[in-house]
From Swiss-Prot:
<keyword id="KW-0808">Transferase</keyword>
<dbReference type="InterPro" id="IPR001544">
    <property type="entry name" value="Aminotrans_IV"/>
</dbReference>
<feature type="binding site">
    <location>
        <position position="99"/>
    </location>
    <ligand>
        <name>substrate</name>
    </ligand>
</feature>
<dbReference type="InterPro" id="IPR018300">
    <property type="entry name" value="Aminotrans_IV_CS"/>
</dbReference>
<keyword id="KW-0663">Pyridoxal phosphate</keyword>
<comment type="similarity">
    <text>Belongs to the class-IV pyridoxal-phosphate-dependent aminotransferase family.</text>
</comment>
<keyword id="KW-0032">Aminotransferase</keyword>
<dbReference type="InterPro" id="IPR036038">
    <property type="entry name" value="Aminotransferase-like"/>
</dbReference>
<dbReference type="InterPro" id="IPR043131">
    <property type="entry name" value="BCAT-like_N"/>
</dbReference>
<feature type="binding site">
    <location>
        <position position="101"/>
    </location>
    <ligand>
        <name>substrate</name>
    </ligand>
</feature>
<dbReference type="InterPro" id="IPR050571">
    <property type="entry name" value="Class-IV_PLP-Dep_Aminotrnsfr"/>
</dbReference>
<feature type="binding site">
    <location>
        <position position="51"/>
    </location>
    <ligand>
        <name>pyridoxal 5'-phosphate</name>
    </ligand>
</feature>
<protein>
    <recommendedName>
        <fullName>D-alanine aminotransferase</fullName>
        <ecNumber>2.6.1.21</ecNumber>
    </recommendedName>
</protein>
<feature type="active site" description="Proton acceptor">
    <location>
        <position position="146"/>
    </location>
</feature>
<feature type="modified residue" description="N6-(pyridoxal phosphate)lysine">
    <location>
        <position position="146"/>
    </location>
</feature>
<dbReference type="GO" id="GO:0019478">
    <property type="term" value="P:D-amino acid catabolic process"/>
</dbReference>
<feature type="binding site">
    <location>
        <position position="178"/>
    </location>
    <ligand>
        <name>pyridoxal 5'-phosphate</name>
    </ligand>
</feature>
Amino acid sequence: MEKIFLNGEFVSPSEAKVSYNDRGYVFGDGIYEYIRVYNGKLFTVTEHYERFLRSANEIGLDLNYSVEELIELSRKLVDMNQIETGAIYIQATRGVAERNHSFPTPEVEPAIVAYTKSYDRPYDHLENGVNGVTVEDIRWLRCDIKSLNLLGNVLAKEYAVKYNAVEAIQHRGETVTEGSSSNAYAIKDGVIYTHPINNYILNGITRIVIKKIAEDYNIPFKEETFTVDFLRNADEVIVSSTSAEVTPVIKLDGEPVNDGKVGPITRQLQEGFEKYIESHSI
């Protein structure tokens, strides 16, 4: 029987209930992580939970969990649910309290829930590429925190769906930031460009992996801003995330990227990613 982790216990889905006064439900006052499972093993799990605890610290949320403890509960959940290929979603909120914008006084216990999902890798997208669109980035100014406040992302993703695209690549003015659920890259003249790490983007775990792969393959990797026009005229465009892995974008705003085919640097990064899965899953 499927199990859900809820506030220190492994329970059935029917028992996994939260209060209507949970601050995650009322305010989006919480954080989350999404961790890939390959061959029954957790991929880059340490990096994910280090970011999880950083996000918690940034919003003043003390979870009383170490990285090691979070990894252990994740392993148990994956084993219980017999997940071979899929993911684990975990979120923490500031807990249950009467509705008030300020933090609860006295403090209440955080609410933590985690569940698993079995699903295959996006082979078709990886092999053939996807359509993308560009859209104005209307999100808040702390995108480096992986918070539950995702309305801006949701609206951007829905815009992509409306125009038969898989991802919306966002921009503030003319400066490209990131995708609605991914980091974004423009490849030009053999160089990978992506937005620098700051409060405008999430420091994606797959982004970190791609940077390391680029170093291994001696591909120049520049963390600097670029424009929407630069993106549209790139030789290759990719988006990356835990679920999307290294996905090529072959059409942007209805026009082909370069010749509309998956490019050679994208293929190198995908090759390196396969090796990284083997070496960084535990």
